[in-house]
Amino acid sequence: MSRVSEYGVPEGVRESDSDTDSVFMYQHTELMQNNASPLVVQTRPPAVLIPLVDVPRPRSRRKASAQLKMQMDRLCNVLGVVLQMATLALVTYIAFVVHTRATSCKRE
């Protein structure tokens, strides 16, 4: 049974450099010594989750709840403004169309 290092790589296996891909290539040295084709094992490094916004974690549930409520209030305010702008644009467009049709009918 072959021994495994602390990184999970069997002894007698070496890591090759690969700048273009995040896949680590390991070639078994024993096969290379026996003039056989090298055995290549591909493994991916563990996924690292990167937060989109760096928000410090509150120390208590009460603070977390208050922070969530504040973020929801901000979101609701932004959505309210967007809805008002969309409504104003729609009403302006309808008024423009009605005015244009009314003036074009009078000319005929």
UniProtKB/Swiss-Prot annotation:
Residues 1-77 are intravirion. It is a single-pass type II membrane protein. Residues 1-20 are annotated as: Disordered. GO terms for cellular component: host cell Golgi membrane; membrane; virion membrane. Phosphorylated. Residues 99-108 are virion surface. It is found in: Virion membrane; Host Golgi apparatus membrane. The keyword Transmembrane applies. Keywords: Host Golgi apparatus, Host membrane, Membrane, Phosphoprotein, Signal-anchor, Transmembrane, Transmembrane helix, Virion. Disulfide bonds: none annotated. The chain crosses the membrane at residues 78-98. Belongs to the varicellovirus ORF1 protein family. Homodimer. This is Structural protein 1.
